[in-house]
Amino acid sequence: MTQPDMSQILAQAQQMQAQLQAAQQEILATTVVGNAGNGLVTVTMAGNGEVSAVTVDPKVVDPEDVETLQDLLLGAFKDAHNKVANVAEEKMGPLSQGMGGLF
């Protein structure tokens, strides 16, 4: 078995690093909207997990039933968080599979 060429390994590593940085930038530039209650509550989240907006339809604001609103807010946040995770997996997944070929 022949030893891999170090310059080739270094070039592959540099290419992977550039692809990783590009994927990270794409993730950071992504904005997703999570929702709950068929859109009655929405959470807008950036790729870094920062929440930039929360909207609540006045129909769900009931002082007698705060728990439902809390559940909807939590559901919308989780939905947005899952969408960010899916975007990250979509962008980073192919790169992690390619790392096996480095060594």
Curated annotation (Swiss-Prot):
Localization: Cytoplasm, Nucleoid
Alphabetized UniProt keyword annotations: Cytoplasm, DNA-binding
One protein family per Pfam: YbaB_DNA_bd
UniProt GO molecular function: DNA binding
Secreted listed as a keyword: no
Cellular component, GO, one term: bacterial nucleoid
Function: Binds to DNA and alters its conformation. May be involved in regulation of gene expression, nucleoid organization and DNA protection.
Family (UniProt): Belongs to the YbaB/EbfC family.
Subunit text: Homodimer.
NCBIfam families in the record: DNA_YbaB_EbfC
Family annotation (HAMAP family): DNA_YbaB_EbfC
Name of the protein: Nucleoid-associated protein Cgl0243/cg0297
Lineage: Bacteria, Bacillati, Actinomycetota, Actinomycetes, Mycobacteriales
